[in-house]
């Protein structure tokens, strides 16, 4: 099966190549093995002796792990033996571990006094290791029995969802070594317990689109949901929050500090971790260090914000546009088709003879009458357009939400995603904008003459009568 736009094809098994011979290397304590694997190829790693971890999650002995389309590092505290090609002895893992222990002290204090646990915000430039640090702190927290709430505010990379989303998830169990954060129920069964993410749709890379009004509104709704969860879940309240952010917020652009301030206020942040940017660290120190938090108990407990500077790992590598596009396509493929490992021997840089079991899913295809759907366009006004054409009072923003029933189906809709919201099909545009997401449809084909679209859905049955959001870049219209 092949779908244009996502290159959804099974790799050919016509050619066979001999796998690379395995090589065993002993890693000294406090060192890490850094590796990069292209999409379409795999590398298999087995821990032979000692202990090791990937972003805080321990590797099981004699278990083969398979990686594809990733850039990561395996670290050992006490030394280990595995099959490796490169060993790095300069690593900030001790620094990151100290952050974990400091957060644990705050969590113990929160449990003893009945206060909320630490709320951590991670800032830094693009490709500085922010998400990796989020995984490490989350994995260490779950390892000692904590249940952190993890928030992803970076729309370019989905967490337990597709790209173009902002999510929040409670982690009660370990993180999946091979699949990063793990999998949601929409990705099928998993050896590691699945997570239940709360998902909001934000299909743009820049949080400052439309002066940041749309992004701010979604952040506020996400923060409200997280705060409500902490109020009802004692374990989550004691453990606190870990918030990952997009690297674009660290740039010297007007509105970035205001956006960071909005995030700090909405989530009542107590600790700001700045990775790899002296300039950003100075700005955060000036604006937030030792300032009272925005929590309701801040006045009574004299709770104040701490700003901490962390080193950027030497293992961080730049991810170009082509790689990020491949990441996005891979996440979308995984959402609908599962995560099958390429079956060709030519694709495998095999360091072990054994393999792991991955799940292949079969999405349900159906044809829909486009005009029968309550589809909302998500368009951004260009600088040349007349602002008088928009009604900011309707949405609190200059963005336009137009019901799909009044529009003809557009061929540009092909190979795009539709987000099914929890909002009613008759809800107001503002409610549709702020609604969380139920699931996604992939538009495989468009018949403009008949007004029909063929979509793929992760589950069978009729599409629920809910408002649906799509994104059209105004520069391409």
UniProtKB/Swiss-Prot annotation:
Gene3D superfamilies: Clp1, DNA binding domain, P-loop containing nucleotide triphosphate hydrolases, Pre-mRNA cleavage complex subunit Clp1, C-terminal domain
Keywords: ATP-binding, mRNA processing, Nucleotide-binding, Nucleus
Region Disordered: start-end pairs: 1-23
A GO BP annotation: tRNA splicing, via endonucleolytic cleavage and ligation
Chief subcellular location: nucleus
Top-rank lineage group of the source organism: Eukaryota
Binding site for ATP: 32, 71, 127-132
Record's subcellular location: Nucleus
Keyword Nucleus: yes
Pfam families in UniProt: Clp1 (PF06807), CLP1_N (PF16573), CLP1_P (PF16575)
GO annotation, cellular component aspect: mRNA cleavage factor complex
InterPro entries: Clp1, Clp1/Grc3, Clp1_C, Clp1_C_sf, Clp1_N, Clp1_N_sf, CLP1_P, P-loop_NTPase
GO MF terms, alphabetically ordered: ATP binding; polynucleotide 5'-hydroxyl-kinase activity
HAMAP family the UniProt entry points to: Clp1
Subunit structure: Component of a pre-mRNA cleavage factor complex. Interacts directly with PCF11.
Family designation: Belongs to the Clp1 family. Clp1 subfamily.
UniProt xrefs under PANTHER family: CLEAVAGE/POLYADENYLATION FACTOR IA SUBUNIT CLP1P, POLYRIBONUCLEOTIDE 5'-HYDROXYL-KINASE CLP1
Function: Required for endonucleolytic cleavage during polyadenylation-dependent pre-mRNA 3'-end formation.
Name of the protein this chain belongs to: mRNA cleavage and polyadenylation factor clp1
